[in-house]
A protein has these predicted regions:
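Glycine/proline-rich, positively charged
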Residues: 1-50, 54
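Short, well-ordered helical secondary-structure segments
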Residues: 2, 19, 56, 115, ...
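Glycine- and other small-residue-rich loops at beta-strand/loop junctions that grip anionic moieties
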Residues: 5, 9-12, 33-35, 56, ...
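A generic "binding-loop/recognition-motif" signal
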Residues: 38, 59-62
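Structured C-terminal cap/extension of enzyme domains
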Residues: 61, 65-167
């Protein structure tokens, strides 16, 4: 199966809903990782392709609203350093008919929001590598042309990791 990755900020091309619909006619295309930032797309794509078109958020920061509107998950950057919490968040955020789980999703989202933001202050994957190094998962070394994050960014990431109860 193939998941289309629609990320206009990096590709400079936005695959519109009609293009998605045409691609979905192909046997192996099952859905999209949507990093457009346009939350209205979820409803538009669901209307055009139906419920079998898998819609995954490509942005941690908007994943809650994305899932509320009909998405079914997120291909997450933050999950690289907070897998368990992100998994709990996703499970709760797709449980629209359970007010307790939605409250839990909101609570987790508030806890993770500073981390989501901090992991994109500088070019990816340098911030994620630094966050992972705080968990002793790896070193913060990156290869050129990437560089390590600045001291200011390190402080922001560390603070966000503490806020999320990860360190």
């Amino acid at each position: 199966p193939i998941i289309i990755y629609n990320i206009p900020p990096r590709s400079v091309v936005d695959m519109n809903v009609d293009t998605m619909a045409r691609l979905f006619e192909l046997k192996n295309i099952i859905g999209v990782k949507d990093a457009t930032g346009d939350l209205n797309r979820v409803n538009q794509q669901k209307k055009k392709m139906g419920p079998d078109f898998i819609q995954l958020s490509g942005e941690d920061g908007t994943a809650l609203e994305f899932n509320i509107r009909g998405g079914v998950g997120c291909i997450s950057v933050t999950a690289n350093v907070a897998a368990k919490v992100c998994s709990e968040f996703q499970e709760a955020s797709i449980s629209k008919n359970n007010s307790n789980l939605m409250a839990e999703a909101n609570e987790i989202n508030e806890k993770l929001t500073p981390l989501h933001k901090s992991l994109f202050i500088e070019s990816s994957p340098s911030p994620v590598k630094y966050a992972a190094s705080l968990l002793k998962l790896c070193s913060d070394e990156v290869r050129l042309p990437l560089v390590k994050v600045t001291e200011e960014t390190k402080k922001t990431i560390r603070s966000a990791m503490i806020h999320a109860n990860l360190i």
